[in-house]
Amino acid sequence: MEVQTKLTAGQISIMINARIKDMVMWLMEDFKYSLEEALDCVYNSELFEKLQDLETGLYYQSSGYNYELLKEEVKYGRILN
């Protein structure tokens, strides 16, 4: 089933990048990751794959919601829900 949205691909990309920026900053604050470690964590995560998949709708969710999922993945090695 294809997601129906009036957003352009560019707008969706901006939304995804905003989520990534916030999560990288929070990883650096909460886990004392370097910029490189935080970027590596996000871009190599299951969450990043799901964020890129428009079918999940995660790009519509807040940065905080996505960050909680990422923290689960960091702690448990996968997203639990």
Specify the residue positions occupied by each region the protein language model found.
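C-terminal alpha-helical interaction appendages
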Residues: 1-81
